[in-house]
Amino acid sequence: MPAETIVILGTVQAGPTLAVCNYLRERFPGCQFIYEQRESRKEFLQRRIRKLGVLTVAGQIAFQAIAVPLLKKLSASRVSQIKAEFGMRTAPISGHVFSSLNSQYAIDQIKALNPACIVVAGTRILNREFLQNFRCPIINIHAGITPLYRGVHGAYWALAEKRPELCGVTIHRVDAGIDTGQVLAQERVKPGPKDNFVTYPWIQLGLGLRLLVRLLPDVIAGRATISEPLTPESRLRTHPTIWEYCWRRIVHGVK
């Protein structure tokens, strides 16, 4: 077990972030936890509308407001089962909280910890200035097979596009792009009949954490090797609209 400091960056009070923090703390003694405040909903929607347009964003909001809460309610026991299977806990862990990890103040505080490795676990995009301030490896657990399923909900999109062989999880280095860093490891995920949009990410996270624990000693020691991605295709994904989700569920059975 390395005694070096591993800094984990995540979003405050986010379940997946806490799962990563708890999992790594139990296995590596030198973990430090840094949290970022959630982006305001207004800023998020304004940015999304500029990129995707009003109609698409309206459909995504409807999906998040109507379908996701229902899926979460119906899937609560399955999520608990997945967490237990992979040994994931989401108990609160205290840490430093910043409004933005890209601020100079946050960068200075993280540098003061002298990290041997930084693990990204659900933050906003780290900008070029942040990345240039650190010589240590910065790696990310991504819920999808990159570079084809960059962005969000890679497992769902792989199944929706009838490419189950590319439903999986990636550990990659973080660069200035969105999930475009060099691949360190990838593993396929095979959801079962009880799984859906809400449970896919938890399965991906569980497998991703197992990969991460195996990789971290080599990453810190500078022995980690770059892997060829399962496909060179590249595309950035966002949330489905409510009509996309309903159509794929009814026609193709993708939940």
Per-region residue spans from a language model:
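One-carbon transfer enzymes
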Residues: 1-255
